[in-house]
């Protein structure tokens, strides 16, 4: 089985980190090696440009892949997005020079030149708006084009907006929001190998939002402590061998709520509270 992942750009490092946490590691890393065995039997990692990954998966050269939602849409390839991986978040925006005076797409004059590598998305966008612009294809940094007179505006990926600001550009419309996605050939949607890959990644994503809270609770405080815990399916409770009646309580808690919950647990009578990272979470 082949798993194609980004070889460069904003998605590469985050993808390798996610795979590592899911227990999938390349046998070695070499920028010259584009097909690398993994530590999993019969699973090879293929490194490719993010924009090429949709057609690599569709063609059957790889069964699954990771790339950006924007690249999937731009490619027009017949693949299925089966998991939002919650990293590489960005927006595809229409941007113009700050001093142009243009505030809305409808204000673009006829023949306005738009530099972008997202030709298909841009064409569809302007056709739906009924705007007569000229789309200029670029393969590198679109944001420099208005500054050198090669274009009047751009459609490009924006993460923080710093690069646009640096080049004197301002966004006037958000075309779409994007993030990294796990994609698969549609005829493999029910393939057990694909389900295994999805489950491995999904368990890590779920775990990243949770903390495991363990505590000892005196018998008389148990009811009050249980009222505090918003566990997924109820906390795990077991009797502790001690001089006074005591319970061990374990629960998975949302990371964003952990600080408030610890205070409430302490006030409710919980003792010896431990907060642990969760590596994987499978509901």
UniProtKB/Swiss-Prot annotation:
Domain of life: Archaea
SUPFAM superfamilies for this protein: GlnB-like (SSF54913), Periplasmic binding protein-like II (SSF53850)
An MF annotation (GO) of this entry: ATP binding
Activity regulation, short description: Feedback inhibited by histidine.
Known catalytic reactions: 1-(5-phospho-beta-D-ribosyl)-ATP + diphosphate = 5-phospho-alpha-D-ribose 1-diphosphate + ATP
Pathway involvement of the protein, from the record: Amino-acid biosynthesis; L-histidine biosynthesis; L-histidine from 5-phospho-alpha-D-ribose 1-diphosphate: step 1/9
EC numbers for this chain: 2.4.2.17
Gene Ontology terms describing biological process: L-histidine biosynthetic process
Chief location: cytoplasm
Parts of the chain that traverse the membrane: none
InterPro entries given in the database record: ATP-PRT_HisG_long, ATP_PRibTrfase_cat, ATP_PRibTrfase_CS, ATP_PRibTrfase_HisG, HisG_C, N-reg_PII-like_a/b, N-reg_PII/ATP_PRibTrfase_C
Classification via Pfam families: HisG (PF01634), HisG_C (PF08029)
Localization of this protein: Cytoplasm
NCBIfam families linked: hisG, HisG_C-term
Function statement: Catalyzes the condensation of ATP and 5-phosphoribose 1-diphosphate to form N'-(5'-phosphoribosyl)-ATP (PR-ATP). Has a crucial role in the pathway because the rate of histidine biosynthesis seems to be controlled primarily by regulation of HisG enzymatic activity.
Protein name listed in UniProt: ATP phosphoribosyltransferase
Species, as recorded: Ignicoccus hospitalis (strain KIN4/I / DSM 18386 / JCM 14125)
Chain's gene name: hisG
